[in-house]
């Protein structure tokens, strides 16, 4: 059942469009629950034995699994269908946005003018958008996060609705569930922590910004992103939801905020969409921006080091097939070591993990042999 919150900025599908979106959601749910496990069955029944016959041992890592699994017709069928279903998500949403485009822009302009919640939007037309944002359409989303027209805001509703369909609603009616998982990690790592100034890096449409204001109503909450089109939508969306937050067009690698300006510097699924050069800069900037006693908390994709080789192989599908171009590096990276290389002291950085159930594992390698989100924590 489609339970996404129908706020004023969300594109309204007609019956035909809604039927297509329902079909795509159902297809992906079927693939996740029924077809994807078939890959493991094929591996156990056939593929690992083929590898062992040639090498005298079982595959030791995901790359060795890939060398044989990619030849399996079942995997090829599943992978092709997975790719098509991802494209179908965006196709099913773009029809609605194309039809509703003028009304959405009018609503955004009206809400921004009325500014009922009292939030702010600050854009910088001279800010360069990094190549890692524009080089490929991340997640196959047409136009990527930045889009082709900064004065428009079509990438916002495309992302908002598309993300909900992509996740099958698993992150809640407002696509904000990951923040609540991260809040649980913070409670485990620093009990009683109550930040008064919060920075959400790579906020996109503000679905990871708005919940921080709800969790800490007295805090000043700021979301930054390099995409003007996403931020226009984020501001209108937050105002429509009645949540006063500030949105600023800025690059997380080097912001214009003063040293020690925030008590919490956070992100949700930002790091794996950057680059090898950008990551240490973001981690160093996070440290510079923290006040004494502040916390850095970056929530990101599951690590594969603790997974069995066939699990790690399947968990890595999006790297090659969904334009997640930096994910293959960050999934195997020692993030605390990367933070130390960016200037963080060794004794203040940790890498807990959190499952979708909310279970928190203080050390990433303490997590069970299942896919868990990873979190990089640093305490100033």
Language model feature labels by segment:
Residues 5-20, 24-29, 52-151:
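N-terminal auxiliary segments of SAM/dcSAM-dependent transferases
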Residues 194-204:
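Conserved class I S-adenosyl-L-methionine
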Residues 227-229:
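Conserved SAM/SAH-binding beta-strand->alpha-helix loop
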Residues 242-254:
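Conserved SAM-binding strand-loop segment of SAM-dependent methyltransferases
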Residues 253-265:
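A short acidic, Gly/Pro-enriched loop at the edge of an enzyme's catalytic core
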Residues 297-359:
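C-terminal alpha-helical "lid/dimerization" subdomain adjacent to the S-adenosyl-L-methionine
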């Amino acid at each position: 059942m489609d339970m996404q919150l129908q706020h004023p900025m969300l594109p309204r599908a007609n019956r035909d469009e809604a039927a297509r979106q329902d079909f795509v959601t159902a297809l992906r749910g079927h693939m996740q629950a029924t077809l994807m496990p078939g890959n493991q069955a094929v591996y156990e029944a056939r593929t690992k034995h083929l590898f062992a016959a040639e090498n005298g041992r079982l595959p030791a890592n995901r790359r060795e699994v890939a060398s044989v699994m990619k030849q399996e017709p079942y995997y090829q069928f599943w992978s092709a269908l997975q790719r098509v279903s991802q494209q179908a998500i965006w196709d099913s949403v773009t029809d609605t946005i194309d039809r509703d485009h003028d009304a959405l822009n009018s609503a955004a302009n009206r809400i921004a003018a009325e500014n009922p919640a009292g939030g702010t939007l600050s854009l910088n037309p001279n800010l360069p958008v990094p190549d890692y944002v524009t080089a490929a359409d991340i997640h196959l989303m047409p136009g990527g996060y930045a889009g082709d027209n900064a004065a428009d805001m079509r990438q916002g509703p495309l992302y908002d609705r598309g993300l909900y369909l992509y996740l099958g609603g698993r992150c809640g009616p407002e696509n904000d569930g990951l923040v609540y998982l991260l809040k649980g990690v913070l409670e485990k790592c620093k009990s009683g922590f109550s930040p008064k100034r919060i920075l959400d890096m790579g906020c996109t449409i503000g679905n990871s910004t708005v919940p921080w204001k709800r969790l800490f109503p007295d805090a000043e909450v700021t979301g930054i992103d390099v995409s003007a089109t996403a931020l226009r939508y984020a501001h209108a969306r937050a105002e429509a939801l009645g949540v006063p937050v500030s949105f600023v067009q800025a690059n997380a690698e080097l912001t214009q905020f003063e040293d020690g300006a925030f008590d919490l510097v956070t992100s949700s699924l930002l790091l794996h969409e950057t680059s090898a050069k950008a990551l240490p800069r973001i981690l160093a900037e996070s440290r510079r921006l923290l006040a004494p006693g502040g916390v850095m908390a970056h929530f990101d994709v599951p690590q594969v080091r603790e997974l069995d080789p066939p699990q790690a192989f399947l968990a890595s599908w999006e790297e090659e097939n969904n334009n997640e171009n930096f994910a293959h590096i960050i999934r195997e990276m020692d993030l605390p070591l990367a933070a130390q290389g960016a200037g963080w002291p060794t004794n203040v950085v940790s890498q807990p993990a959190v499952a979708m159930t909310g279970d928190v594992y203080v050390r990433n390698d303490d997590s069970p042999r299942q896919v868990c989100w990873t979190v990089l924590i640093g305490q100033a």
